[in-house]
Amino acid sequence: MFLTQGVIAERLTGKSWEENIKERFFAPLGMDRSNVSIKELENSTNAALGYELYKDSVLRKMPYYKIAAMAPAGSINSSVNEMAKWLKVWINNGKYNNRVKFNF
């Protein structure tokens, strides 16, 4: 469902899903550390890493799961603080910092 919504948004705006997210959500909310690709995440200086136990004895870094082909279904990388901004918009019916930012 989210993938379909992303494709519809691309068709309506003439911009990629990634461009729409950055311009319409990240920028207005000041979500400067959030990104929408594994490449951006890997280039980040402050990203959490996942680890796994390999063959029951070796702890090793897990590769990031690349889901670019279905990005609108969950390819946003963010911090707790920045996701809290997004949640405030939803909780406050589109308002953020006492200003209307989004119409749902």
Language model feature labels by segment:
Residues 1-104:
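Short, surface-exposed loop or secondary-structure junction motifs
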